[in-house]
Amino acid sequence: MRIDIKDSTMVKPAAETPGGSVWLTNLDLLSPANYHTLSVHFYHHDGSENFFDAAALKEALSRALVDFYPYAGRLKLKDNRLEIDCNGEGVLLVEAESDGALAELGEFAPRPDLNLIPQVDYAKGISTYPLMLFQLTRFKCGGVGLGVANEHHLSDGVAALHFINTWAHLARGVPAPSPPPVFDRRSLSARNPPKPQFSHAEYQPPPTLPTPLTDTAIAYSKLKVTRDQLGALKAKCLAGDPSGKPRSTFEVLAGHIWRCVCAARGLPEDQETKLHIPFDGRAKLRLPPGYFGNAIFFATPVATCGEIESNSLAHAVKRVGDAIARLDEDYLRSSIDFLELQEDISKLAQGAHSFRCPNLWVISWVRLPVYEPDFGWGKAVYMGPWAAPFEGKSYLLPNPDNDGSLFVAITLHTQHMERFEKLFYEI
């Protein structure tokens, strides 16, 4: 399949916007350097003549940037700390065409070889590249892919989707959704003086293998979990838990994935493994509605592979649930203070080294409004990550059919994937 770039436009706010800078919190600064989160929304053609009209989309995007003006800015350093320079330079919108059809993408597994998202040139420095880039790719079947590259220092997925959904509302001629974005980040400032109360294992180096694997080829898989299978997993977990405590869908699936990955990797019983679970702190910290920035913390249970494999599903799920339950307001405030005391927060940034074998990352997009953006021609048939897959990273994704099923998208070493898939369905 071939992708041909037809046009590129730097879209600027439709009206004058505030200047100055947006301060970045310690949580914002945890984002890796030179990194945009990559995802794609796919839409089937609805039969209309003006399907995803580029001019209309640019006009709506320009209007959306009036409220979300920091996206039109650029990164800059001040006193050796990153911030957003609100200079109004704009976001990039690329138009492209493909000689292939959406059906050829099958289950929409990430294809980094297909340029469905604009390439970011990091070589010229942080002040030169856009914080948000979009690509509208038209397929020969009439469908489109909307590729998104979001610079993570400015916003997490919740905030980015707030912006994209606002753009979609304006494109279809309805008022922007409430609430408006809130850029005041003082609610996530460290206390003065900082008072960390915990050791914060989430920011400690992850376990490593004593001898690196020689075969590092990776494979990607997307597995469907039906409503009945979820029910069976929950029942199995409940039957093995003397406390009789019901567990959430996320806790049960994360525990199940952790057990299956540990077994599939075949590591020694005494090998430590760390599970990374991103957690949205907006509710716990009572952040203002519309808070725009990163509010992601981490639950990170650590165990030996032997402990996770040899005990019941209920045990692994309890480890997950206990780690998440620990993230109360006191713990989250302590986390911010802990970061305040670090000389260089960027050294603690999560990345490929954090969740590769023997570790694991499980993130849920199930409650994110990933299927809300409707630009006037219907909702997406699929939305998901499109980056080069990192070994050990997995996503829980909603099913657009809304039938109670979910998808688990995961990347593992090729030598481990077949066994993982077999174990995953042994419910």
Curated annotation (Swiss-Prot):
Q: Where along the chain is the active site annotated?
A: 152 (proton acceptor), 374 (proton acceptor)
| Protein keywords | Acyltransferase, Transferase
Question: Which residue ranges does the record annotate as region Disordered?
Answer: 181-208
Q: What range does the record give for the signal peptide?
A: none
Question: Could you identify this protein by its name?
Answer: Rosmarinate synthase
Protein's UniProt keywords contain Transcription: no
Catalytic function, reaction form = (2R)-3-(3,4-dihydroxyphenyl)lactate + (E)-caffeoyl-CoA = (R)-rosmarinate + CoA
One example GO MF annotation? rosmarinate synthase activity
- What is the pH dependence? Optimum pH is 7.1.
EC annotation? 2.3.1.140
Could you name the domain of life of the organism this protein comes from? Answer: Eukaryota
| UniProt enzyme class | transferase
Q: What does this protein do?
A: Catalyzes the formation of rosmarinic acid using caffeoyl-CoA and 3.4-dihydroxyphenyllactate as substrates. Can also use 4-coumaroyl-CoA and 4-hydroxyphenyllactate as substrates. Rosmarinic acid is an ester of caffeic acid and 3,4-dihydroxyphenyllactic acid.
Q: Which Pfam families match?
A: Transferase
Give the family per the record: Belongs to the plant acyltransferase family.
